[in-house]
Amino acid sequence: MVTIRLARHGAKKRPFYQVVVTDSRNARNGRFIERVGFFNPIASEKEEGTRLDLDRIAHWVGQGATISDRVAALIKAANKAA
């Protein structure tokens, strides 16, 4: 099953997440199909904290991909801000 979820990157104590489309059987930071955005939970005021390609996310949801709870919250916040 294809899912849209977060893959953790960054350094110890400084997380940075990529929003990826991947097979649910793959490891958290393993192989992915497409990167559709990023999320930086510790971004400063000057830095961009979240960027999502909502068109590609809608495409994958139309293809039957499921969305993780955290990514769903990020999408909701992005739609509210837009």
Swiss-Prot record:
Keywords: Ribonucleoprotein, Ribosomal protein
GO cellular component assignments: cytoplasm; small ribosomal subunit
Disulfide bond annotation, renumbered to this chain: none
Pfam families: Ribosomal_S16
GO molecular function per UniProt: structural constituent of ribosome
PROSITE patterns hit by this protein: RIBOSOMAL_S16
InterPro entries associated with the record: Ribosomal_bS16, Ribosomal_bS16_CS, Ribosomal_bS16_dom_sf
This protein's record includes keyword tRNA processing: no
Ribosomal protein recorded as keyword: yes
GO biological process: translation
PANTHER family noted in UniProt: 30S RIBOSOMAL PROTEIN S16, SMALL RIBOSOMAL SUBUNIT PROTEIN BS16M
Family: Belongs to the bacterial ribosomal protein bS16 family.
Protein known as: Small ribosomal subunit protein bS16
Gene source species: Citrobacter koseri (strain ATCC BAA-895 / CDC 4225-83 / SGSC4696)
Protein's gene: rpsP
